[in-house]
Amino acid sequence: MAFSKLGAAITLDVQEEVFNWLCDANRPIEVQDFTSPNMLNSDFSDLVLKYKDKLKSHTGTKGLHGPFFGLDLGNQETEFQKLISKRLLTALDICEQLSSEYMVIHSPFNEWMNLNKRQYPHVQSSTISAMGDILELPLKRASEIGCTLVLENCDDTDPNMRLSAIQDINHPNLKLSIDTGHAHLSHSNYKAPSVVDFISAAEGYLAHVHLQDVDGYADRHWLPGEGSITWPAVVDALKICSTKPHLIIEVRKNMHRIPNSINYLESLFQI
């Protein structure tokens, strides 16, 4: 099966040569400058204008990482839910201005919920219900601007919890995202399923993948091949994925190596 063109997550200060390399081939670009706490409560119009100018020649897929610090999508307090929805709506306004096809949001599920499914059987359903309330207006807005919200695993150890949330909320603009590093951390520390199993569990709903490597100890955001993830197996799992998800390298340093890393992954897709 044909795979999506690989791209990268960037901030405005990314090296010009890397940005130009992405733009020259119209590779997907994911903007990550709008995630800091309280940022969406300030005047960010200049930053949006800078991005619009920087991206004016880019015709590839554009995405945005939405805000997540302190914004628990499973929060059951009504007043907090309103604030979280407001933050997501503000981020979606930015998506509209930058023509973003998707926005990444973080999953509220974790190992405590997984371990206590029988002890506290209402927790998962209550979390999904809260998600539905929080995302109701953002999903309406997303559908109006042609944007998809993609729910990324963060502390998840049971990939079926996110799947159940997507299925229960049942909105065409809500899909799944997988962060390979997060999945490998859960596998290494909590004996959660491996990255390839996270991918297979998302089949039919997977719209986006953050490709990053880790050592199994911390959320390193290293380039693929620099940690302990078995990349040929991950690529094999993505090859048979029917949904053709956006494939985004998400790293924190050594951005100048992104072209080589993309070439490496693309070589695996060709095997």
Regions found by a protein language model. Name each.
Residues 9-13, 32-36, 67-69, 108-110, ...:
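Active-site beta-loop-alpha junctions enriched in small/polar residues
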Residues 28-31, 63, 150-151, 177-178, ...:
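Generic enzyme active-site microenvironment
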Residues 51-69, 128-144, 231-237:
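Alpha-helix-loop-beta-strand connector modules within alpha/beta enzyme cores
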Residues 1-92, 96, 270-271:
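N-terminal pre-domain/capping segments
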Residues 10, 14, 43-47, 83-87, ...:
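Soluble or luminal CAZymes and related metallo-dependent hydrolases
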Residues 74-175:
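Active-site acidic/histidine proton-transfer and metal-coordination neighborhood
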Residues 1-5, 16-25, 73-74, 85, ...:
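Histidine-acidic metal/acid-base catalytic patches
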